[in-house]
């Protein structure tokens, strides 16, 4: 017999403990219907409203007073009509009401009133717990749901600890947690969306402080101190389909400029022209790729005047121009406050009523800030603030910066114990309601003002604090991660950042970075940190946005940790730059579908329960599996490989059978990495920065499938910095390699799309990891010449006429070189 336990969402703010109410058994007496909405009326005047957003998404609203009213429209949901649902028929029976869709059976039991949702095969997916499904006391609301013995949960955005949430509890309250530990909660963002292996997701759309408990107590619950109990039940055949429906509700992620996918350098006191130039020259002198140099908070004269600090920057415009010539973009921080020391701007904002108010006296709230003295907190929920902030924000853009790092938006120094800030009154409500969306409202203003004043240019904004829906405006990073008592103890935080970032990706933060090196701790012994630094960089190379950052005046450039660390760091960074065509294609997929580039194994292998506990590795796209080394002194790594055949990507030769754990070598010089048999990986030459050469050859690494199967990849390309990707101004090139009994058929289809022209002419080089020597190769039925391997790649960048092939018997690689004409090409590779 299966024993059922409970999971709960808890929204707790005013009352620290729950007091049981004795009269919570509810009876449903009738229903009314209007369009997509069916409202069930209860004997105690409460109401349960179901709204069909689609055949698989149901909005559920429990209202104890039956009013079904919200103070504010949703900050996260932008579309509740995901598809036509036709006429909704409610089937009334003696004990229940039932609604059927093509995918779901929804049952509302009359007495005691409870909600159950089944799939079309009558499998129970989601159920209230008996007569305690919906409990309320005053403004506080609690939901109890049945938990199966084999049920697991994933999501809730950026959270520390293991990815499988079962047996844990989590709070939603954006908190500034400097040097947070590997078990810290809550953190900076609130994404109240999770998924169950029972093929459903839940998005709780309540911005107050909430708490989720997944089987932590004998009777578990989810609870809200205020606001409405509104949540969305999202059914899908797998996690990908659930995420797709969540995207439909909350919006697509924006796509970053291509340069944002390169490497970035920062540190806490990187706040001067001199230091910026030194770092830029250091990277270029050593040939280590880098695209971005950040300026931390001290770049401004005052918070937040957007003026370059006098004495630190002799000529900011010339500095930015010179760095641009070297291939660097500059991103600067901004905080959401105006320092009182910034007298002119503070008085202007105070006079205009642009600050959050103190509800006890009606004056601008006086906020102590970590630096810069006391500040006024800008009220981004007030519409008039947007243009005012945008005018100031535009000044450094006009000087030549390329983006913003929106920091401290919790707002800073906020944590769940600090109730004194609840007196803050925003235009759209009191702080207990607005706190979790404060950063989101700021991010929205930054993005929309950037696009308004810089037409057809992609925004780059990386934020720390946000709420569900942030993907429409910004990218993320995981905040000020701690390293324990000593920076050399940072191995635990390095390991922790893997599940933190994977979970962030499931919450529609597909483009993010951690602070590579871990944020906290003074570095006193650079040689002693060399190994840890190397492993941080190796992991960081697979962050979608890769930023090296550390607190204070602790330099963390690769050349400071010794020759071996520099060499290994450079190799890891170069690997990312080689993979940019692959990464950029997946950036487009993230825009289209919401799926993260860096993804947990269960996203691709949902039926393999072994993947539920693989927190120390991840997929990078579908084809690559990465297993960072996160233990001091380790030179091996225990890796789980899911179904299929996997090949060591570092040597391109060692083959592993999937659905098992295996221990692999992990020298300090490389990161364990695998490619699935039947994959095609597009690569490019390593450059100092992403746009160093507008025209370059593309290399496709082909790992053929088994006989009778195919390897395939569709390459995505666009301009890289404008908004053409939203106007379908891009091209795609489908490539298929079919494995035959006597060879391979490699098909390059004509480019698909319009509005963008690929720079050219250029070459395409195919490296086929075959292990079988070809007899001949034909292109469109015509034999092409064979040459030596070392000759095949001569002058690849300039000679776009040569068609040839080679065979390297030492490596088992067959290489074919053809010009890229954008037309159909068919290559036949016949074995001896």
Which role does the model predict for each range below?
Residues 17, 54, 509-510:
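Generic signature of intrinsically disordered, low-complexity, basic-rich segments
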Residues 122-670, 675-676:
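Catalytic-domain carbohydrate-binding cleft regions of carbohydrate-active enzymes
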Residues 655, 663-665, 791-796, 802:
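Positively charged interface segments
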Residues 810-814:
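Aromatic sugar-binding surface patches on proteins
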